[in-house]
């Protein structure tokens, strides 16, 4: 039986594509393994999925671009993670390793290359994260969502592989209940803050609940179960799975962070959106780049977190609603998306 090892973690964005690809390989008779951190979100998501995947936990250390005494300890963790991954590779003898990035992926990528296992990696953002910059040196091939520099000879630009589609599905019973609390004459605004929610969105909704629910139906994915609420024109929930796409479809506008996975999901269904990217003080600046790219393409509006107020947000919402056809036409004309089936066929071809 052929074997494939997946790796990637730290955030949902570094796990999502793996979760979409693994069932395809399982259906085709592959034995699927995953290397990650048992305390990480990658382990939680695989357990939730119920997929027949063997999980191998390794030591991980965070890759920092700045000086920290923790870097000294983390160097040892990364080295130990490489040793652990090498033993896993030598024991399994897989045909290939697929990495979605994140600091947990570096040891398995290095170990795979050392043990002669072909390495395929995927980069979602406009600029490579530090983990993938390291991984690229050991990779057989990298697939990218955005165009990359021509000097990166191992990169193939494939566009975004998204987990949502424009196919309409039957409404879940829970969605019917949510809609019964909404005023159908008002536009519906969905706040999406990534896998852990976004404190700034949660605070805005909390501080301006009265004003917002007078003018909009509000859906707030919070990442915090203490905020859960279903009331007149308001639905707040910590986390959703099956409801994710139905809520996307229900919304007239989405207010989101600038993670590549989410904004390309919105592009795939031509959904109006305002991007509030994480700034450089909280990230490496990838979300700022993603947001600027989407604004330049005419797909979205952006708003810096430091400028986010009720008034500034409503100005953006009003602009999007009044120019809905223009934004949707540009999104529908985009050539930057690839279906999961097409990407899987491309990957299988490269593995053969």
Swiss-Prot record:
EC number(s) from the headed UniProt entry: 2.4.1.227
Single GO molecular function: undecaprenyldiphospho-muramoylpentapeptide beta-N-acetylglucosaminyltransferase activity
Leading EC class: transferase
Entries under InterPro entries matching the protein: GlcNAc_MurG, Glyco_trans_28_C, GlycoTrans_28_N
Protein location: Cell membrane
SUPFAM superfamilies the record matches: UDP-Glycosyltransferase/glycogen phosphorylase
Keywords carried by this UniProt record: Cell cycle, Cell division, Cell membrane, Cell shape, Cell wall biogenesis/degradation, Glycosyltransferase, Membrane, Peptidoglycan synthesis, Transferase
A GO-annotated cellular component: plasma membrane
Binding site for UDP-N-acetyl-alpha-D-glucosamine: 195, 287
CDD domains registered for this protein in UniProt: GT28_MurG (cd03785)
Pathway(s) this gene product operates in, as recorded in its UniProt entry: Cell wall biogenesis; peptidoglycan biosynthesis
Enzymatic reactions: Mur2Ac(oyl-L-Ala-gamma-D-Glu-L-Lys-D-Ala-D-Ala)-di-trans,octa-cis-undecaprenyl diphosphate + UDP-N-acetyl-alpha-D-glucosamine = beta-D-GlcNAc-(1->4)-Mur2Ac(oyl-L-Ala-gamma-D-Glu-L-Lys-D-Ala-D-Ala)-di-trans,octa-cis-undecaprenyl diphosphate + UDP + H(+)
Keyword Chaperone: no
Topology versus the membrane: Peripheral membrane protein
GO biological process: carbohydrate metabolic process; cell division; cell wall organization; lipid glycosylation; peptidoglycan biosynthetic process; regulation of cell shape
Organism domain of life: Bacteria
Entry-linked PANTHER family: UDP-N-ACETYLGLUCOSAMINE--N-ACETYLMURAMYL-(PENTAPEPTIDE) PYROPHOSPHORYL-UNDECAPRENOL N-ACETYLGLUCOSAMINE TRANSFERASE, UDP-N-ACETYLGLUCOSAMINE--N-ACETYLMURAMYL-(PENTAPEPTIDE) PYROPHOSPHORYL-UNDECAPRENOL N-ACETYLGLUCOSAMINE TRANSFERASE 1
Similarity comment: family membership: Belongs to the glycosyltransferase 28 family. MurG subfamily.
Matching HAMAP family: MurG (MF_00033)
Role: Cell wall formation. Catalyzes the transfer of a GlcNAc subunit on undecaprenyl-pyrophosphoryl-MurNAc-pentapeptide (lipid intermediate I) to form undecaprenyl-pyrophosphoryl-MurNAc-(pentapeptide)GlcNAc (lipid intermediate II).
Name of the protein: UDP-N-acetylglucosamine--N-acetylmuramyl-(pentapeptide) pyrophosphoryl-undecaprenol N-acetylglucosamine transferase
Organism: Streptococcus pneumoniae serotype 19F (strain G54)
Gene designation per UniProt: murG
């Amino acid at each position: 039986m052929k074997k494939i090892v997946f790796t990637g973690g730290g955030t949902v964005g570094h796990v999502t594509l793996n979760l979409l690809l693994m069932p395809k390989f399982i259906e085709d008779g592959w034995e699927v393994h995953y290397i990650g951190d048992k305390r990480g979100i990658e382990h939680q998501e695989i357990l939730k999925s119920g997929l027949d995947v063997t999980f191998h936990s390794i030591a991980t250390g965070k890759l920092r671009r700045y000086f920290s005494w923790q870097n000294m300890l983390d160097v040892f963790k990364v080295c130990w993670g490489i040793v652990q991954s090498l033993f896993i590779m030598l024991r399994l003898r897989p045909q290939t390793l697929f990495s979605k990035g994140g600091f947990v992926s570096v040891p398995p990528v290095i170990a795979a290359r050392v043990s002669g296992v072909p390495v395929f990696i995927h980069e979602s953002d406009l600029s490579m994260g530090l983990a993938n910059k390291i991984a690229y040196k050991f990779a057989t091939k990298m697939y990218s969502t955005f165009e990359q520099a021509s000097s990166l000879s191992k990169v193939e630009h494939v566009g975004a592989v998204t987990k949502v589609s424009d196919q309409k599905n039957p409404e879940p019973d829970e969605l019917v209940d949510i809609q019964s609390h909404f005023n159908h004459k008002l536009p519906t605004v969905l706040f999406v803050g990534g896998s852990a929610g976004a404190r700034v969105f949660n605070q805005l909704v909390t501080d301006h609940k009265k004003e917002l629910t007078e003018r909009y139906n509000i859906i707030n994915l919070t990442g915090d179960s203490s905020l859960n609420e279903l009331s007149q024109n308001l639905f707040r929930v910590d986390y959703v799975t099956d409801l994710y796409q139905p809520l996307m479809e229900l919304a007239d506008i989405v207010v989101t962070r600038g993670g590549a996975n989410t904004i390309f999901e919105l592009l795939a269904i031509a959904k109006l959106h305002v991007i509030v990217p994480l700034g450089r003080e909280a990230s490496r600046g990838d979300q700022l780049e993603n947001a600027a790219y989407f604004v330049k393409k005419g797909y979205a509006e952006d708003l810096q977190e430091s400028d986010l107020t009720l008034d500034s947000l409503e100005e953006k919402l009003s602009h999007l609603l009044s120019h809905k056809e223009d934004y949707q036409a540009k999104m529908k004309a985009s050539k930057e998306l690839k279906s999961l089936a097409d990407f899987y066929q491309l990957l299988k071809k490269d593995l053969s």
